[in-house]
Curated annotation (Swiss-Prot):
Entries under NCBIfam families matching the protein: recomb_radB
UniProt protein name: DNA repair and recombination protein RadB
Any GO MF annotation of the entry: damaged DNA binding
Record keyword DNA damage present: yes
Keyword Nucleotide-binding assigned: yes
UniProt xrefs under HAMAP family: RadB
One annotated GO biological process: DNA repair
InterPro entries noted in UniProt: AAA+_ATPase, DNA_recomb/repair_Rad51_C, DNA_repair_and_recomb_RadB, P-loop_NTPase, RecA_ATP-bd
Species lineage: Archaea, Methanobacteriati, Methanobacteriota, Archaeoglobi, Archaeoglobales
CDD domains: archRadB (cd01394)
Pfam families recorded: Rad51
Amino acid sequence: MQRMLIPTGSKCIDSLLGGGVETGTVTQIYGHGGTGKTTLCLMLAKNAAEQFKVAYIDTEGLSGERVRQIFGDERLFSNVFVYEVYRFRQQGVAIQEAEKLCRSEKVKLVIVDCFTSLYRSELEDDRKQIKIKRELTSQLTFLLGMARKYDVAVVITNQMFTDVGSGVDRPLGGPSLEHLSKVIIALERSNELRKATLIKHRWMKEGKSCFYRITDRGIEP
């Protein structure tokens, strides 16, 4: 099946992805705070909303001002179904609701921003850790199945943690998230600029990087 590409609107990021985010699979964007993960998601949502509907699961509280900066035309934002979730269990319910929209509406992009923030807060309870980790994997497995079944692009953002043993910063979720995400982009600070690196892709060259700035208009170039 010929997959569609949804452009991010950033020349830097689109060059790494071969034109944009691919439908039929899961793309993971990870990085520390302030690297532009949500900005990139909003840019993707705007581009998709010009022709299709978008399901946006928001776990961190979208800034209304940032939405206005990126979208400009509020009528375009009416094509975005926003789910605000505050607990990890609600996130699973919202994902199920997004699947219904893929069936009933012209949804071509599903975003979960951030996929791991509510999971991370639940991890503080040691008694729940195994159950919570299984649920996270289950949610992403469901999203991947949804992407393939309805040929939609699924984009998740992921936070970082410092590995106590090695002192190295790593994305949350471990090998399961890495395996189920078929495309992975790492965002990081690089002095006054930001740097995007393609960690994993099915057909583009991995390891390539580019530099960008975060502005009122989004990610440039």
